[in-house]
Amino acid sequence: MIPIAICDDELLHARQTQAAIRRCEAQAVTRCFETPLALLAAVTQQGYAPRVAVLDIRMAGMDGIELAKRLNALVPGCAVIFLTAYLSYAPDVYETRHVYFVLKRELDRRIGSALRATGNN
């Protein structure tokens, strides 16, 4: 089983991402978080250690890039996939360790490639 964290402050988008992942990765065990702080709490307080994290970038409070930096430190083996509706964030993701950048409008077409790039399949 591959534990995959999904963090998106829009629950509908998180559920769409979850469904897309399940269609292309049978071994996925997904867990959705609506805030970066909820995901960080699961990691630091519950010992949750996802092997993959699919992170929206634009979120209230802490953005997905800052969340990725913290996950990089807390769970070094976690492969980060950024998911956003805004191409303008592309340059900023290089401040973190990540494996893929997916535009939300291309989710169904790209998520399989992104998951394969993590090396967890």
PLM regions and their residue ranges:
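Acidic, metal-coordinating helix/loop segments flanking the phosphotransfer/catalytic sites
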Residues: 18, 32-52
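Acidic catalytic/metal-coordinating carboxylates
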Residues: 35, 63-66
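Active-site residues of response regulator receiver
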Residues: 8, 55-56
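Two-component/phosphorelay signaling modules centered on CheY-like receiver
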Residues: 2, 11-33
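The feature encodes the CheY-like receiver
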Residues: 60
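Short amphipathic alpha-helix used as the core "switch/output" element in two-component signaling
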Residues: 41, 65-77
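Alpha4 helix (beta4-alpha4-beta5 surface) of REC/receiver domains from two-component response regulators
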Residues: 66, 70, 85-102
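C-terminal output helix
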Residues: 106-115
